[in-house]
């Protein structure tokens, strides 16, 4: 994404003074997230003929793994919403207790939100951006009630977010650059959100993407007749909350510029990520170069001469020739005067394993996942759930990072409810209470929780139906039914055995 081109476009057309320098940091983070940093992973080595060749440095791609782990910790299939108004809850989540229906299901919200957390954690910021398709507007561009309309969401990382106005740390106006396909060709959708006198104006512009001679993508604005159906150039709404919400990793940015944007979760761990890849590459190279080698006197070999008159020696075993190495003199050998000698290099597995483990521990610590998030023992990885020594660090950092995500989730849900009521005519309450129920299995595992609930049920501290619901994923009604059936069966058994056999 050539975001600099759109910054230049906005500065020119809207007389802004946006700066593109901070997006250079985001590009570096993107390279680390992909596991391909040219200055690090493109190694220069001397070839036998004296030329310089490139070798790809092996990479564990830990920055991406770290972002995936944070996304799975913070927003996963066990994250649920609690909405006070029943009709509003049914509209968003569906009527079942598993919250698998409603508008959020139509939008594939949870899987997209999980991906957005990963993108926000590598890029420094994520944005939920709402739009309404098939909206009716008057001649002035004001949005009118549109029962035929449909709510849509975009999920943008920091490289697609251009803050325009920031008040007390909160982005109030912004532009969003979203990539898409139109007619099988790449295109870009630029949406600008501005506020004037309590009214919000959303401007939509489309650009087609072409490749310049230099290889840099060029963007040319499309005319209205070529844009997607169901979109308008501009709409204005009054009394609405922001149609976007942003969140970032919960760390104070120590980089200059980029007001309104955050920094990557691994921004402070780039040296540790580099150490991980160097240690892993060294481990890999030791294994690759550590095969058996046989040094032999060239007089043992059959000779042949090519058409240019150069003599070549044929190794004793042409199939496994990579293990044979010629000695330059007929008398020579390594440490002995023998015609041939076998050599088995030491792989140094213990030292290499420890180097990789030390680097992973540093990476885990710097990315706020605790000191031993990634610990390999006998071929298995021990996560922080089992390693109690680092659990407290993880718990504190996870709780801290839930705050901005919860704010963003509630913000975009209120925008969706406002549009649903005021534009689509849905029977919802935008002011209804909304809270997020987080998954805390990183603190106590599901098995530990179930076992404790079972003990409490046996002791009479909690109803048995609660244990059944948790153990077998039952609804409250199903759990009560199971409890009643179990009680009836026990009474039947007592009646059958009353008075003896």
Model-derived regions, located:
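Extended, regular secondary-structure scaffolds
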Residues: 122, 127-263
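Short coil/turn segments at secondary-structure boundaries
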Residues: 116-119, 130-132, 287-295, 373-378, ...
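Charge-rich, acidic-biased intrinsically disordered regions
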Residues: 26-27, 44, 133, 139-153, ...
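Extended, charged amphipathic alpha-helical segments
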Residues: 226-389
């Amino acid at each position: 994404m050539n975001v600099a081109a759109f910054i230049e476009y906005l500065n020119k057309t809207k007389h802004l003074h946006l700066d593109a320098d901070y997006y250079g940091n985001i590009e570096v983070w993107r390279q680390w997230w992909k596991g391909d940093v040219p200055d690090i992973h493109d190694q220069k080595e001397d070839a036998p003929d004296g030329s310089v060749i490139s070798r790809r440095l092996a990479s564990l791609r830990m920055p991406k793994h770290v972002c995936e782990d944070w996304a799975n910790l913070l927003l996963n299939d066990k994250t649920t919403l609690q909405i006070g108004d029943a009709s509003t809850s049914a509209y968003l989540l569906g009527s079942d207790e598993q919250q698998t229906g409603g508008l959020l299901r139509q939008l594939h919200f949870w899987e997209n939100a999980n991906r957005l957390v990963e993108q926000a954690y590598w890029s420094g910021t994520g944005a939920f951006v709402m739009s309404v398709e098939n909206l009716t507007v008057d001649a002035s561009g004001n949005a009118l009630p549109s029962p035929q309309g449909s709510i849509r969401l975009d999920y943008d990382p920091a490289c697609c977010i251009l803050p325009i106005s920031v008040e007390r740390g909160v982005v109030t106006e912004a532009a969003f650059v979203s990539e898409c396909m139109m007619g099988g060709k790449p295109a870009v959708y630029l949406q600008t959100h501005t506020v004037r006198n309590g009214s919000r104006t959303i401007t939509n512009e489309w650009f087609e993407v072409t490749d310049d001679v230099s290889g840099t993508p060029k963007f040319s604005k499309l005319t209205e007749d070529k844009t997607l159906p169901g979109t308008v150039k501009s709409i204005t709404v009054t009394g609405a909350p922001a149609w976007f919400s942003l969140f970032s990793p919960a760390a104070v940015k120590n980089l200059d510029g980029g007001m309104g944007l955050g920094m990557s979760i691994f921004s402070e761990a780039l040296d540790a990520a580099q150490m991980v890849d160097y240690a892993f590459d060294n481990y890999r190279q030791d294994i690759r170069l550590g095969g058996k080698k046989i040094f032999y006197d060239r007089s043992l070999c059959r000779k042949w001469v090519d058409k240019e008159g150069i003599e070549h020696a044929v190794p004793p075993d042409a199939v496994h020739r990579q293990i044979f190495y010629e000695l330059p003199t007929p008398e020579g050998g390594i440490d002995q005067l023998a015609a041939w000698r076998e050599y088995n290099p030491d792989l140094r597995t213990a030292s290499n394993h420890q180097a990789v483990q030390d680097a992973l521990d540093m990476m885990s610590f710097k990315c706020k996942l605790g000191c031993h998030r990634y610990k390999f023992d006998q071929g298995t990885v021990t996560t922080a759930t089992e390693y109690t020594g680092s659990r407290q660090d993880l718990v504190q950092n996870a709780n801290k990072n839930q705050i901005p995500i919860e704010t963003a989730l509630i913000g975009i849900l209120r925008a969706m409810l406002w549009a649903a009521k005021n534009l689509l005519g849905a029977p919802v309450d935008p002011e209804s209470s909304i809270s997020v129920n987080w998954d805390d299995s990183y603190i106590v595992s599901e098995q530990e929780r179930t076992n404790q609930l079972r003990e409490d049920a046996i002791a009479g501290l909690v109803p048995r139906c609660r244990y059944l619901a948790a153990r077998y994923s039952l609804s409250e009604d199903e759990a009560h039914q199971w409890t009643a059936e179990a009680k009836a069966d026990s009474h039947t058994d007592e009646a059958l055995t009353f008075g003896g056999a």
